UniProtKB/Swiss-Prot annotation:
A motif (DECH box) lies at residues 161-164. The record marks 1371 as: Important for activity. Its EC number is 3.1.26.-. Mg(2+) binds at residues 1280, 1375, 1378. GO terms for cellular component: cytoplasm; nucleus. This is Endoribonuclease Dicer homolog 3a. Residues 879-1006 form the PAZ domain. Residues 1413-1481 form the DRBM domain. It comes from the Eukaryota.
């Protein structure tokens, strides 16, 4: 075999390889043929147009050039790129893949669908620096050159694929004429074509030479082809050309064509009559009518064409296609697109009526056609003889019959690959359907391929690609296509090309023939027998090709064409700074694009209008732009024809738009960047979102800071008395005084707060007592008292060295070893009771504690542990009990507070036992084995202590306990195991342990138990005081002096939900959001009177978005004040207290304050809010933005708009409202608007109860943008922008103040239900505002009329109307309500109270929690989530309609419903409403007579053990099921699943089994299992050591919990089993869940993996 001849198999493999995207590839080598090398060498010497046969490898020559030029670019480091241009997207993609495979360059493709038209200069520069080869459509390159994003100086090589397109006004032509021939530094040019002749053919040698020269001159290149064609003819498969002749039509259906014409005229008249019946004469309605008639005419033309060309059956199929398209409302989409309207077709009566007429026409037309067809036509086509009969009767045309015969002649049909070229898209579609009906061709797979986007007969780009891929792979045998597949499409396996419709040009002939790439392939021309015209056409084309090849190969290489001589005058406008330019040719599209960016709605699209004036020697065009444009009227220069006049006036307009700033210096539409500094600094992923996690520090409280505690001199400190009053008689709490070296804010100094203990409440009050002086000795005693009590109760008094076997150290042993933290310094000292503001510190108690500290120092200094028995006596005297430092009577021990010298723990003595040191250590234990015989032996071996009085009785002590969160009533039951018998609900509560201890190890502290009680209140109390002080500190930083802005409001604003307080920032955030929106809207409205609503909205969006608020908050250190973690009393530290739960700082920062670059993390497992010991904590970026809004809301709630504006100023948000701008805006409205002659608005003013001072504001508020077509210079959109913010703040303020006890979630729902366009639309209809709307749109009138009729004729409420799938109200109705609100606000000079007084009755009844209706989809999701069900969702497109299928698997039945709508959201709402009705019918949905929150909380709020699992997931291990529990107590056991078991990973940490079970049920759509937990009596616990090491006889817990789990497997089984008993309810539920998982594993449902 000749090595030059590549097999078709290798060619196919090359193409398939080209389809693979390799991220980092090694370029594939190929061996070029001799003629390819020849062309390559010529192209390296000069600009060349390679004229080679299709399939000859022109692209590979281009690849060789790319390699060489790329190498040069790299060597010279010139930074130049190579541009490869291809005329279609398919070719761009195909060629890009080939270049990627065969080169090592970075290659990218560019076309319009990628959005490159919207790219900016920096984006293009990024592409240039990243890629060396850029493959693109010529229009993309042309536009980038015109915008000066790319310049030819940066291009080293331009490749033109299918360069014969460079004629007329093609982008190839524009690139060369506008840029290349004017450039000083021209890149090299390489063109590729199989036919340089673009016209029908060539008439002579001179004509051919002229067309060659024209192309050469334009591309500045020389045509080159191979003179010796032997190698090409050998290497490139050449299709065998043949003609198939068909007979003339035996039957002409002229009478049927006439009948169809008459029918079309009839319906044309009906459409006209339909329009004449309308009372209005709106232009858009006229446009719809005209377009509808035009479409009707086009449809009948298609049907008649099919009737004449392919026969009666195909005409019937064409009619059916029209009917199907009408059913999908495809024709309506065409009408909408053609008239540049964006109206929802369902929203216009005119659309519906026209649609009905079209459908009736098609049905009648089909009836006329089908009655000519005999019964059983489908059976007729199942045989060859039937097809012959069909041809004779005209059912199929002879031409189509001959095509069928060709198909029938194919051998090895399963591998046949045939392209059939037709002229029209409808032909491809109907023949495709026809062939599928023919039985003896059923072994073929048939499809069609059509291009373009303007027709509904065309395929989308994706469908085109999929169809071509199917044809290439052999899934499709017969592909009917238009000329879209003529050029460049690589199908190496194509064995036959049929020209069902003859080619019209030499280029079409050559290109289509070149698609037949297989060896021995065929190229079949179908010609009517005896048709001289067709024969002459083919003969001329063949002669043209022969002459073209001959002339091209015989031209001498030295015979260069003359240089390019421009034969047209190019009018253009240049921008000197960038080099961008616009030509007269491109100016029209720019003007249209500019108008498209102007404000518009569904019933009005701004467009330019052109008027032409004829003069003797030409035309003058007057351009009128919409009133919202910066330029309205422009008269252009005179031109020779109307088109040129239109171009020139648009060119002048582009120049003016650039001068006025509407076009930027790149002649792109100006996109305003209102806050560029914000945008530039906010670059990053997820700024202001919950996805972004950042590390921030905590702001110190200035009032707490200081080093005064270390001074050895007398001090004067501010004193604040703390008084505690319990609501239970006999419960006494000692008074205390807070001493601090700063003056606390008044609200803190007068604080009153309720602290919630388990079974009681303590009212706490703080009062200022002025300065109090302490001498140096008192300071020392006070510090010892505080250090002893807080460490002895909540911490530890001993530390152990890291040195092995080193003795413990007493932390108060040396003054210099225990340093107080200067960040938080204060003293809490007990006082004697007093009834005035005087403070009388109880120094006797303080001195006693200090004495105990000194005693402990003596005991633990210099290893003098023998001093333990300081007080010694050989005999017990009477009822004396020997303590560590004294003896006392037994009856005085009750409630004595003591300190254990060996553990450093503080206890309260309860009783004397009968046990002694000599008693058996395990005497009260059921434990079989024990290490110690007696208590005395235990203390000797454990602590090295020899009891001096082993015979004296042991004391029963109550140990100190951990502090609790007492700030909220919801925490009062935290940590207890008792049963609340009032409601029968078991509440977890740990029973207090009782400790047995020898008295001689105890030091009495001589302080009453009342003082000890007060100490347990301090963690919660001081946490609240610290928080309020921090909030007050932030208030001071803001600097607005208003006593109404309380610290409590500020505290609420900086507290997140994660804190689990009774309050959070959510409500204030909602209010602040509305306030911010209102303030910024007013500011922008007044400051920019010439900006339209779209521009104002864009600026507002930038100013109030979370990214901006985040940036401003960071600049003001708001993040340091945010409270983002729940109060953990065990980690709270008093001054002088050592932490027993440290959290060492491992953060990537050195200082406490994060001042450098913000650290970001993507770890989803990161714990938010929890601070390390230096105060660093991870926080969501959005939290900071939310806090900013909440602070604004707090100031508005406390001090009104003036206070909120002060916060905005402090933040740096420019939202000032100047009085003179208000006056100017009112004056402008009064000047530019006009009043109707009869004042029709008096009735509206009467409805409003308000008379406008400036009537023009009301006129503007009711003027629709469509009025601008009649000359109006204004519309309601700016006032709508203002009114939107007005109604938002008014309704939010009302809801905030009216529902103070409503939680933040429900408040958000209330606002959403109140502030929305549908609600406002109903208000407009209720008060007949629509009667006063000034507009010029028939479509809008139809929409409003239909909506009003539906609303008035329905008894359903708003939610039912929406959820039933009916369209929402026209947006314009809600808009005018907002614009009226904006007009009144402006007329009253921004008096919100007046506006509310007018609108409150208009908006009534305003939604309340009692009648709040959640959106159906939201309600369904929440209900299912609460009850343990999952919602299956599947959405698909069906024509222009979205079909949403939702299903809910209940325990016994699967509920499935479908919803339909134009939008996915509305379709899901429709389906959800139907499912909710089903659930209600089954009695599962609660009647809607209460708020949603109350319903859910009451009926299913906290019963689901699988809710909030992440809260319970802790690092505690979940035991495996015991062996005796593996057997399940179940009924009807069967394997619920078939197939391979699911792999389930279960974490053994707390919550892990429940999470795994939840994920399993969600995946399988099983209802969540139910849990029932009950008390169980555990075994008696053994005697054990306390954490401090003391011996204790542990009292058994009152009970533990065991949980029973029940799983309903749909249509299969019910499994019920009980887990092991656990100490708390959640752990017992984990045990039950784990048992169930193991049971499912036993059944083969899953395979468990524990981690």
């Amino acid at each position: 075999m000749n090595p030059l001849k590549r097999s078709l198999e290798s060619s196919s493999q090359e193409h398939e390889a080209g389809k693979q995207k390799l991220q980092k590839r090694e370029c594939q080598d190929f061996t070029p043929r001799r003629y390819q090398l020849d062309v390559y060498e010529v192209a390296m010497r000069r600009n060349t147009i390679a004229m080679l046969d299709t399939g000859a490898g022109k692209t590979m020559i281009a690849v060789m050039l790319i390699k060489e030029f790329g190498k040069i670019n790299r060597t010279k480091n010139a930074g130049k790129v190579i541009i490869f241009l291809a005329p279609t997207v398919q070719l761009v993609t195909q060629q890009c893949e080939v270049i990627e495979i065969h080169t090592d360059f970075e290659v990218e493709q560019y076309y319009g669908a990628k959005g490159v038209d919207q790219w900016t200069g920096p984006r293009w520069q990024e592409q240039i620096s990243k890629y060396q080869v850029m493959v693109m459509t010529p229009q993309v390159f042309l536009q980038a050159l015109r915008n000066a994003f790319l310049i030819l100086d940066m291009v080293s090589l331009m490749i033109f694929d299918e360069c014969h397109h460079a004629t007329g006004n093609h982008p190839y032509t524009r690139i060369m004429k506008e840029f290349y021939h004017k450039s000083e530094h021209k890149p090299s040019v390489f063109g590729m074509t199989a036919s340089p002749v673009i016209r029908k053919g060539i008439s002579s040698h001179l004509d051919c030479e002229g067309q060659f020269c024209e192309l050469e001159n334009l591309l500045d290149a020389k045509i080159y082809t191979v003179s010796d064609r032997e190698e090409i003819e050998f290497c490139v498969p050449s299709a065998k050309e043949m003609c198939r002749y068909y007979d003339s039509k035996p039957v002409c259906f002229e009478d049927l064509s006439e009948e169809l014409g008459v029918l079309c005229s009839k319906y044309d008249a009906l459409i006209t009559e339909l329009q004449n019946k309308r009372s209005d004469m709106y232009k858009d309605a006229d446009d719809i009518t005209k377009e509808s008639k035009r479409r009707l005419s086009k449809s009948i033309a298609k049907i008649c064409y099919c009737l004449d060309d392919v026969g009666l059956i195909c005409a019937s199929e064409a009619t059916k296609i029209c009917i199907e398209r009408g059913q999908e409302k495809g024709w309506l989409k065409e009408v909408v697109d053609a008239t540049d309207q964006q109206t929802d077709a369902n929203g216009s009566r005119l659309f519906a009526e026209n649609s009905a007429l079209h459908m009736k026409f098609f049905e009648e037309a089909l009836h006329l056609i089908d009655k000519r067809l005999q019964q059983g036509i489908d059976m007729l086509l199942n045989s060859e003889s039937g097809c012959v009969e069909a041809a004779k009767t005209g059912y199929i045309s002879p031409k189509l019959y001959e095509l069928i015969q060709i198909f029938h002649s194919f051998s090895n049909s399963r591998h046949a690959r045939c392209l059939i070229f037709v002229d029209r898209k409808i032909t491809a579609r109907v023949i495709d359907r026809m062939i599928k009906k023919i039985g003896h061709l059923a072994h073929f797979t048939v499809s069609f391929l059509t291009g373009g986007r303007s027709s509904v007969d065309a395929l989308t780009p994706k469908m085109q690609k999929d169809t071509l891929d199917s044809f290439r792979s052999g899934k499709v045998n017969l592909l009917f296509t238009t000329d879209v597949a003529e050029e460049g499409i690589h199908v190496p396996e194509c064995s036959c090309v049929i020209r069902f419709d003859l080619p019209r040009t030499t280029r079409s002939y050559v290109q289509s023939r070149g698609r037949a790439r297989q060896e021995d392939s065929q190229y079949i021309l179908m010609i009517e027998r005896g048709n001289v015209k067709q024969n002459d056409l083919i003969s001329a084309i063949v002669r043209s090709e022969t002459s073209m090849v001959k002339i091209a190969s015989s031209r001498e290489s030295g015979n260069l064409s003359p240089g390019f001589v421009p034969n047209e005058e190019i009018n253009e406008y240049h921008v000197g700074t960038t080099g961008a330019k616009v030509t007269a040719d491109s100016s029209i599209s720019i003007v249209y694009r500019y108008c498209e960016k102007l404000p518009q709605d569904k019933c009005y699209s701004p467009k330019p209008t052109f008027e032409f004036t004829h003069h003797d020697d030409g035309y003058v065009c007057t351009l009128a732009l919409p009133p919202s444009a910066v330029l309205q009227i422009l008269v252009g220069p005179k031109a020779r024809n109307m088109h040129k006049a239109k171009q020139l006036v648009c060119l002048d307009a582009c120049k003016k738009l650039h001068e006025l700033g509407a076009l930027d210096d790149h002649l792109c539409l100006s996109v305003e960047d209102p806050v560029p500094e914000i945008v530039s600094k906010n670059k990053g992923t997820g700024i202001g979102t919950t996805k972004r996690k950042e590390l921030h520090g905590t702001t110190r409280i200035h009032a707490w800071s200081g080093n005064w505690v270390s001074k050895k001199t007398a001090l004067k400190l501010q004193s604040y008395k703390m008084n505690f009053v319990c609501d239970q008689a006999g419960q006494i709490y000692s008074e205390f005084v807070l001493l601090i070296d700063a003056t606390l804010p008044d609200e803190v100094a007068t604080l009153e707060i309720d602290l919630y203990l388990h079974d009681k409440m303590v009212k706490t009050s703080v009062s200022s007592c002025g300065l109090l002086e302490l001498d140096a000795q008192q300071m020392e005693q006070a510090k010892l008292f505080q250090g002893l009590l807080f460490n002895g109760l909540f911490g530890k008094l001993f530390t152990r060295s890291k040195v092995p076997n080193a003795p413990r150290e007493f932390i108060l042993n040396k003054e210099d070893t225990f340093v107080w933290n200067t960040a938080s310094v204060y003293l809490l000292l007990p006082t004697n009771p007093s009834f005035d503001s005087n403070v009388c510190i109880n120094w006797s108690v303080i001195d006693a504690a200090a004495t105990a500290v000194k005693l402990m120092r003596r005991i633990y200094s210099e290893n003098k542990r023998e001093l333990l028995g300081i007080f010694d006596s050989d005999q017990n005297v009477g009822d004396l009990i020997h303590l560590a430092n004294k003896s006392c009577k037994a009856n005085s021990l009750k409630d004595m507070v003591v300190l254990a010298v060996h553990t450093g723990k503080i206890y309260t003595a309860l009783d004397i036992t009968e046990l002694s040191g000599d008693s058996a250590f395990d005497g009260a234990s059921d434990k079989k084995e024990c290490k110690f015989r007696t208590f005395a032996e235990y203390f000797k071996k454990k602590y090295g202590i020899v009891l001096r009085h082993p015979s004296q009785p042991l004391l029963v002590l109550k140990p100190s306990h951990n502090p609790h969160n007492l700030l909220s009533s919801k925490f009062r039951d935290e940590g207890n195991v008792v049963e609340n018998m009032s409601n029968g609900t078991p509440v977890v509560n740990k029973t207090s342990n009782r400790v047995h201890m020898p008295p001689e190890l105890l030091i009495p502290l001589d302080l009453p138990v009342e003082i000890l009680r007060s100490f347990y209140l301090f963690p919660a109390l001081m946490y609240r005081i610290e928080s309020l002080t921090l909030a007050s500190q932030l208030r001071s930083e803001i600097g607005y002096s208003d006593s109404n802005i309380s610290s409590f409001l500020i505290l609420e604003a900086i507290t997140t939900l994660r804190c689990s307080e009774d309050f959070s920032m959510e409500r204030l955030e909602l209010l602040g959001d509305s306030v911010l929106k209102y303030a910024v809207s007013c500011h922008l409205f007044l400051k920019f009177p010439n900006k339209d609503e779209g521009q104002l909205s864009s600026i507002r969006c930038h100013m109030i978005c979370n990214a901006t608020l985040y940036k401003l908050g960071i600049e003001r250190n708001v993040q340091g004040y945010v409270r983002d973690a729940a109060f953990d009393p065990r980690r709270w530290l008093a001054p002088g207290q050592l932490s027993i739960r440290p959290s060492p700082c491992e953060c990537p920062v050195k200082s406490e304050v994060v001042t450098d670059d913000i650290h970001i993390i993507d770890d989803k497992a990161i714990v938010l809010g929890k601070a390390c010991d230096k105060g660093h904590r991870w926080m969501c970026s959005k939290t900071i933005a939310d806090c900013v809004e909440a602070i604004i809301g707090a100031y508005y709630a406390g001090g009104g708009l003036r206070a909120a504006m002060a916060v905005l100023k402090w933040l740096g948000i420019g939202a000032e409202i100047e009085e003179d701008l208000i006056v100017q805006a009112i004056l402008s409205a009064s000047v530019q608007t006009y009043l109707p002659k009869d004042n029709v608005f008096e009735m509206l003013e009467a409805k409003l109860g308000y008379s406008f001072s400036v009537k023009g504001l009301l006129v503007e508020a009711l003027t629709h943008p469509s009025q601008q077509e009649l000359g109006a210079k204004y519309c309601y959109e700016r006032l709508e922008f203002l009114g939107d913010a007005v109604l938002d703040i008014l309704l939010t303020r009302y809801l905030f103040n009216s529902h103070k006890d409503t939680n933040e979630g429900e408040l958000t729902d209330l606002r959403s239900a109140s502030v929305n366009n549908e609600n406002f639309a109903q208000v407009a209809v209720k008060h007949n505002f629509h009667h006063f709307l000034q507009h010029s749109s028939g479509l809008l009138l139809d929409q409003i009329t239909e909506y009003v009729n539906r609303l008035e004729g329905s008894s359903m409420d708003k939610v039912e109307l929406l959820s039933d799938g009916l369209p929402k109200g026209p947006k314009v109705l809600g808009d005018i309500v907002e614009s009226i609100a904006g007009a009144i606000l402006l007329d009253t000079k921004l008096d919100l109270d007046v506006v509310w007084g007018i609108f409150e009755p208009l908006l009534s009844p305003i939604v309340t929690p009692e009648n709040l209706e959640l959106p159906p989809y939201r309600e369904l999701i929440e209900w299912c989530g609460k009850h343990g069900y999952f919602v299956g969702i599947n959405c698909r497109d069906q024509g222009d309609t979205v079909v949403a299928t939702l299903d809910v698997q209940l325990k016994e039945v699967l509920l499935v419903r479908q919803g339909f709508s134009k939008k996915r959201k509305d379709a899901k709402a429709h389906a959800s409403s139907l499912l909710l009705k089903d659930l209600e019918e089954k009695g599962l949905i609660i009647p809607k007579n209460a708020s949603k929150t109350e319903q859910f909380e009451k009926h299913c709020g906290s019963t689901n053990p699988f809710n909030n699992l992440h809260v319970d997931a802790m690092d505690t291990q979940t035991p495996k099921p015991t062996k005796e529990k593996n057997a399940a107590d179940s009924r009807n056991i069967s394997d619920p699943l078939l197939g391979k078991p699911l792999h389930v990973i279960v974490k053994t940490s707390k919550g892990g089994p429940r999470i795994a079970l939840y994920e399993l049920c969600k995946k399988l759509q099983w209802p969540m299992p139910t849990m029932e937990s009950e008390k169980v009596q555990p075994s008696f616990s053994s005697v054990c050591s306390s954490p401090g090491g003391s011996s204790q006889k542990a009292t058994p817990q009152a009970f533990a919990f065991a949980s029973t789990i029940t799983l309903h497997i749909p249509n299969a089984d019910v499994i019920s089993l009980t887990g092991d008993g656990r100490a708390d309810k959640k752990s017992s539920q984990d045990s039950a869940a784990l048992f169930l998982l193991y049971e499912l594993q036993r059944r083969g449902t899953l395979q468990l993996q524990e981690v």
